[in-house]
Structure formats: C-alpha cells, structure tokens
Amino acid sequence: MKQTLGAVPAARLTGTGPMSVAKQEADVQQAAAKPFIKGKFLTGSDIGLAVGIIIILTVLFLPVPAVVLDIGLAFSIAFSVLILMVALWIQRPLDFSAFPTVLLIATMMRLSLNIATTRVILTHGNEGYLAAGHVIHGFSQFVMGGDFVIGLVVFAILIIVNFLVITKGATRIAEVGARFTLDAIPGKQMAIDADLSSGLIDEKEAQRRRRELEEESSFFGSMDGASKFVRGDAIAGLIITAVNIFGGIVIGATRHGMDISQAADVFTKLSVGDGLVTQIPALIVSLAAGLLVSKGGTRGSADQAIFGQLGAYPKALLIAALLLFILGVMPGLPAFPFFLLGGAMAFVGIAVPRRQARQREADAAEAGKKQREAEEQERNSVKASLETNQIELCLGKQLSARLIASQEELAHRVNKMRRKFAQEYGFVIPEIKVTDDIALPPKSYRIKIHGTAVASHELRVGEILVVLGERPVPSVPGEEVREPAFGMRAYSVPETFTADLRREGYMTVDNLSVLLTHLSEIVRNNLAQLLSYKDMRILLDRLGPEYRKLLEDICPAHISYSGLQAVLKLLLAERISIRNLHLILEAIAEIAPLVRRPEMIVEHVRMRMAQQICGDLSDNGVLNVLRLGNRWDLVFHQSLKRDAKGEIVEFDIDPRLLEQFGTEASAAIRKHFDNGERFVLVSSPEARPYIRMIIERLFATLPVLSHVEIARGVEVKSLGAIS
C-alpha cells in the first residue's frame, strides 16, 4: 500500500500495508476489549436475560399479586407486538435468526402467566371481578361486553383461527422449508466451491457464503420445531381456560358458598378474560411466525414485497376497480364503500404506470451516468497505472512495522527536508511516496527515482550507528560497517549501549536518521532529474515584470524553453542552486546570442554565479581547495580536441592514463573525506566539465570548480594537489 509523505504544508502517513496492519491489529484488540467491559459489566444484557428466565420460572410456583399480574400481562402483549413489528420489517428471515429462541421464551412467559392467573382466579375469584387484576377484568368487559357467552364464542374463534389456520399453515411451511433447505445444502456447497475454484469469489466471500448457508439450514430446522411451540400453546390455552371455568364453578359452589349461577357468571368471565388476554398475544406471535416462514427467499421488508408485487400489475388493479364499481351499482348493496375502494384502486392503477415510466427514465439516466463514470474511472485508472512516482521509498515488512511508532516524526522530518531543499536549491521537490514492499528483505529499504531503483540498504533493526571517520572503534560490542549515504566508516551497536557510547564521546545515529540522510543524498544526486518542465514554468511564472521582459527577449529568440531547462538541469546536476533565477537569466542573455550549446552556456553562467557558488561551498568563509597538479592539468589539456574555429569537439584520453588518474585521485580525495573535511577540486576552465564527469563516478558529491569560478574576496585554503 502507498502512503504520501512530505506533502506541503502537512503530511500524514496512512495505508494498509504492514505499517498500517500492525496499527489496525492494535486498534482491533483495543476495540474488542471495549464491548466486553460495557456489555458484560455495565449494560448487563446477558444477566438481564438470565434474571428474566428466573422470574418466569418463579411465577410458575409462587403466588403473584394482581398488580404484578397486570404488569406481566401488559408486558406479554407489548412483547408480542414487538416481535410482530420486527418480523414485518426484516429484509430476510435470517435477519431474525433468534426467532425460535424468542418464540420459546414468549411461549413460556405466557404459560407461566396463565398458571399464575389460574391460581389467582381459583383462589380469590369469589372476591369479585377485580380479583385477578384490572387487565383481565378490562378484557372481559371490552371484548365480551359483559356477557360470558359472547366471550366464549370469541375465545373459540380465536382458538380456531390460531390453531387450525395460522399455526397449522406456518408449521407446514416450516416443515417443507426445512426439508428443502437441507436437501439443497450439498448443491449450494458445490456451487460455492466451483465459484471459488473459478476465481469468481475469494476465500473470504466463500467463507461468508458457507457460514450463511449453515445459518440458513440451522434456522429453518429450528423453525420446524419452534412452530410446535405455537401449536402446543394454543392447545394449552384451551385446556387451561376449560379447567378454570369448571374448577372455578366447583370451588365457588363448594368452598365459598356461592350458588351455581353466580359461580358460573364470575368464574366464566374471569376465565374467558384470562384466555383472551393470553390468546391474543399468542395469535400475534403466531402471525409473526407465519410471516417469517412464508417470506422465503423474498428480499426486502414485508410491506415492500406485498405492495411492490400487488402494485406491479396496473391492469389487475383496474379490473378489480371495475368489479367493485359493478358491485356498487347492484341493488341491495351499499354503493359508498364499493365506489370508495374502486376509486382508490383505479387511481393506483392509473398512477402506478406513470410513476413506473418516470422511474424507468430516472433509472436509465442514472445507469447512463454510472456507465460514463465507470468509463471515465477506467480511463483514469489506466492513466494512473502508466504514471510513476517521481520519488518513492520502499520499505521491507519488518522495517515498515518498526517505523510505525515514529510515523509522525517521519512525516515531519520529510516535510522539513523538502522545505530545506526548496530554500537551498530554489524549487520544490516532488512528494515522496512511501510504499510497503513485501518483495524486499524485511529490514531493507529501496529508493526509486521515476520508478527506477537508484539505491538500497539494509538497516539493523534494534541497533544504532556511530560514524567513526578516523576515530578508533568503541569499546562496546558491535560490528564495523559503512554508512549508506556517504560510504564513511561506521560502527553498528545495539541500542542498549547508547549511554555507554555517549560517555565515550561518540555521537549516535538512529535508523530513521540513517534512512532520511541516505534519502536526502539520493535526492541531491538526482536534482536534475526531478526538475520537470512544469516545475521550470512555475519558477518562470513567479518572476517579476522586469525579468519577464528579459525572459521574453531571450526565449525563444536565442534559446528555447527546453534549452533553458537543460541549463538549469546542468546546474542542479552539480548541486548549484537555481534560487537566483534572475542572475541566471542575465548570464544567459549575455552568452546566448553567441553560443547555442547548453554545456557552453552553463560554463558562463557558473562564472557569473561564482560568488554564490563559493559562498555555498565555503566553510566559515574559508574555501578548502584540492588542486589538480600540473602534470594532470597538462594531460587533460592535451586530451581536448578542437575544430578549425578553436571550439572543443572531443575529449580523448588514454584509458591507462584515465585509470591511473582515478587511482591517484581516489587516494587523495578519500583521505580528506575520511577526515570529514569539506573541500572542492579546482582545475582549468576548459577541462573542468570533463574532469567533473570522471570525478562524479568516483565521488558524486565532490564539487569541481575552475579557477575563474573562485570569487574575489574568498579566502582559499590549499589542501594539496593530485600529482
């Protein structure tokens, strides 16, 4: 995964590679602990369910006051309505996979309340109609109208509807659904395996489908058994009501001295009221079970499925409306309800096609828009795949995970490095992409410029680096190595010896600093490649009005914009800042009418920039100089081939002399490099570019100046000569 560092003004390190994976794993572990604390010790949902079951069992055996019965019966009705609403709104049956368990709890709750009300009715029924509570009395008055015969009829109808219609149908649907689901499991499993083998789905999707298939078979199997709860509940309600009526009459007549008619009136009303209070929630739950099992494979909530499918055929609605109008004009039938319903159906039958037409147009427009967006996205993705990052830092798995703790510091220091480059060299380097690359060794990193690897190194995770130079090796255990940025002698030591090294006077460098120093030097060595044509035009657009006129005078009359870019690149290739762009343009304006080659133009520009060059390369106002000896100066001068006009056209040197020069120059330069000295190599103006090409292959960071590039007033300190 890729992460962008160094974006001005701020940078963030984000991604899904190993750097982000370790962080995500920590976040997951932290998040996993939170529900455990809140769910188990604060909300107490699991304890609440256990307490509820215990209360249900307690009601079976202990006498309950009428007030508590009222609360329990009201809760039973509310719980049943909640179950029905959930069954109506779920998108698919598996979304309510806990329904069998809920059904068992609801059935057990109603039976326990039934037993509790039976105990109260038989014990205190002689005290009057309010002996069993206000809920039972209210149902007996409201539903029965004060007549127990009406109550018996209504109760019988509820039992028949619940037992013979809803419950029996739901039971049959559950049986068939369970059988067909179990029979289809092998075929569905084979289909999942086939899709996985063909690559249509990945392993994660296959596991999800298998888990869903397992849940589906378990759900329908449970529903097949759970439907028996509803059926048994209806039978138990009928038997309990009959026992209440006959038992109440006997107890009232024999124990409480009531006459038969009075006992029959009181106990029948209370028993039938009790039966209605328990059978209505049972009917509601049976309806929810029927809705759930009859939903089948239909997607969406029940209202969406019903109204969507009934309203999908406008002709059927219009024909039904016509039939209602005909019934409305028939003699003896009331016209108003039939005309009202017929008009409503006719309105829906006419409005639905228009709405469907508008919806089809909107869908077609949306589909066209999505298709255009998909095509545009595909074109952009192809373009993006062709683009390469200008600067890319690839990290091995272990190294990227190790740097997670310092990602903010990494982003801050990269930002700081980009700002420093902008101030030092006069243009903003591109953003640096950080990539987790599992193909790299775990502790290694690789630096790419324009998609091409230019440097790599393996860090010692858990160790620090001591740059030695000419100093002896520290007394602590470690291993002598070369630091990657400059190739200087260094000593790698475990982090535990940091304090010991500081006591001995050694400066320590951590892995992040080693990496960023190496990255910084690689960027310096490739500044010319990083200055794009776009960057150059941005610099030119920032010029003031007076220098815009100068630019118009020289471009494109004497030098093209690409030629101007070549001059700037040649300067940056030798780490010469282009921040004084106006001075560069003035120098080009002086020489461009006379010469065309960028190599010749840049030598004149360097001479005009001598003050800046020496100022940037001097150390506390002193320019340390390593000269090219007279012998080698003569060799290089004789290797320059000129044409009739005296212009240099070729550099031809004997390979043996070139090899000898490389050996002698390396020895002299390495000596001063190991001492940590900052210096420049000085040669003749004509040979300077060619000597620079040779030295660059040996010491890329060593500046090579000509005699004319040493500005007046600069204090020069000679370090000797290559002779």
UniProtKB/Swiss-Prot annotation:
<feature type="transmembrane region" description="Helical">
    <location>
        <begin position="71"/>
        <end position="91"/>
    </location>
</feature>
<dbReference type="InterPro" id="IPR042194">
    <property type="entry name" value="FHIPEP_1"/>
</dbReference>
<keyword id="KW-0813">Transport</keyword>
<dbReference type="GO" id="GO:0009306">
    <property type="term" value="P:protein secretion"/>
</dbReference>
<dbReference type="InterPro" id="IPR042193">
    <property type="entry name" value="FHIPEP_3"/>
</dbReference>
<keyword id="KW-0653">Protein transport</keyword>
<comment type="function">
    <text>Required for formation of the rod structure of the flagellar apparatus. May constitute the export apparatus of flagellin. The flagellum is required to cause a persistent disease in a murine model of infection.</text>
</comment>
<keyword id="KW-0812">Transmembrane</keyword>
<dbReference type="InterPro" id="IPR001712">
    <property type="entry name" value="T3SS_FHIPEP"/>
</dbReference>
<feature type="transmembrane region" description="Helical">
    <location>
        <begin position="272"/>
        <end position="292"/>
    </location>
</feature>
<feature type="transmembrane region" description="Helical">
    <location>
        <begin position="146"/>
        <end position="166"/>
    </location>
</feature>
<keyword id="KW-1003">Cell membrane</keyword>
<dbReference type="Pfam" id="PF00771">
    <property type="entry name" value="FHIPEP"/>
</dbReference>
<feature type="transmembrane region" description="Helical">
    <location>
        <begin position="234"/>
        <end position="254"/>
    </location>
</feature>
<feature type="compositionally biased region" description="Basic and acidic residues">
    <location>
        <begin position="361"/>
        <end position="381"/>
    </location>
</feature>
<dbReference type="InterPro" id="IPR042196">
    <property type="entry name" value="FHIPEP_4"/>
</dbReference>
<keyword id="KW-1133">Transmembrane helix</keyword>
<feature type="region of interest" description="Disordered">
    <location>
        <begin position="361"/>
        <end position="382"/>
    </location>
</feature>
<keyword id="KW-1005">Bacterial flagellum biogenesis</keyword>
<feature type="transmembrane region" description="Helical">
    <location>
        <begin position="316"/>
        <end position="336"/>
    </location>
</feature>
<keyword id="KW-1006">Bacterial flagellum protein export</keyword>
<dbReference type="GO" id="GO:0044780">
    <property type="term" value="P:bacterial-type flagellum assembly"/>
</dbReference>
<dbReference type="GO" id="GO:0005886">
    <property type="term" value="C:plasma membrane"/>
</dbReference>
<protein>
    <recommendedName>
        <fullName>Flagellar biosynthesis protein FlhA</fullName>
    </recommendedName>
</protein>
<feature type="transmembrane region" description="Helical">
    <location>
        <begin position="96"/>
        <end position="116"/>
    </location>
</feature>
<keyword id="KW-0472">Membrane</keyword>
<dbReference type="InterPro" id="IPR006301">
    <property type="entry name" value="FlhA"/>
</dbReference>
<feature type="transmembrane region" description="Helical">
    <location>
        <begin position="49"/>
        <end position="69"/>
    </location>
</feature>
<comment type="similarity">
    <text>Belongs to the FHIPEP (flagella/HR/invasion proteins export pore) family.</text>
</comment>
